[in-house]
Swiss-Prot record:
PANTHER family (UniProt xref): PEROXIDE STRESS RESISTANCE PROTEIN YAAA, PEROXIDE STRESS RESPONSE PROTEIN YAAA
Gene name tied to this protein: yaaA
Disulfide bonds: none
UniProt family annotation: Belongs to the UPF0246 family.
Gene Ontology process terms (BP): response to hydroperoxide
A single Gene Ontology CC term: cytosol
InterPro entries: YaaA
Protein name: UPF0246 protein YaaA
Source organism, top-level taxon: Bacteria
Amino acid sequence: MLILISPAKTLDYQSPLTTTRYTLPELLDNSQQLIHEARKLTPPQISTLMRISDKLAGINAARFHDWQPDFTPANARQAILAFKGDVYTGLQAETFSEDDFDFAQQHLRMLSGLYGVLRPLDLMQPYRLEMGIRLENARGKDLYQFWGDIITNKLNEALAAQGDNVVINLAADEYFKSVKPKKLNAEIIKPVFLDEKNGKFKIISFYAKKARGLMSRFIIENRLTKPEQLTGFNSEGYFFDEDSSSNGELVFKRYEQR
C-alpha cells in the first residue's frame, strides 16, 4: 500500500530532529531544472505568480538563489520533519519511532512541485513551489507539463518494490493532478472526511487536512497493508460510514461537538 500526501507551505528547520537517518531525493536533476527557471523571476514576479506578500516573495527568491544540489544534514532536513502544515499536525512524525520511519519510508510518499516525489527521510532544502503554479519551463507552460509521467513512473517503482497495487490518495486535488491514474499500476482508494456543521456533513478544509495526516499516522502506526483495514480508523471522533462509501471512496464522518 502506498500513501500519497501533499507537502506544506509552512516549514520547520529549527526543531530537534527525531532521527538522524536520511536519504536523498531521487529526482534532483529535475529539481535543478526548475530552480534554474525560478531564479529568473524577480521578487515582484514571484509575488504575482504565487499570490503571496512582498515579504514572502523576497524569502522565496532567496531560497531559490541559495538552493544547491549537494544536500547534507547541515543545509537540508528530512522532508517528513520539515513540513509543518495541517496534514503534518495530524501526522505528528516528530513522535515516530525508528520502526515507524522504516514503515513510512516504504509506504508514504509526498508529492512536491519542486521535488516531484519525496520519501519521508529524503533531505530537502526549503522552498515554496506549489504544484498548481504556472511556472513556464522547457517542457511546457506549468508544472503538470514539466513532470509529465515522471511522478507516476516513480510511484510505480515504489509499488513494484513492495509488490503491491493499492494507492491511498490522501493528497489534495492540486497535487494528485500530477499523477496519471490510467498509467498508475494500482487501484486508487480515496478516504474522504466529512464534518457535521449545522446538522449537515461536509468537507471542512482545515479538519479534512488534519484528518489526512491522522489517517496516514493510523496506517503507519498499525502497519496496515490492506485497504479494508482503513475502515477501523476512529481517531479524534471520526467513524467509517459504509452507506456513503463506494469501492474507490471511503467516507468517514464526525459529529459536531455539542
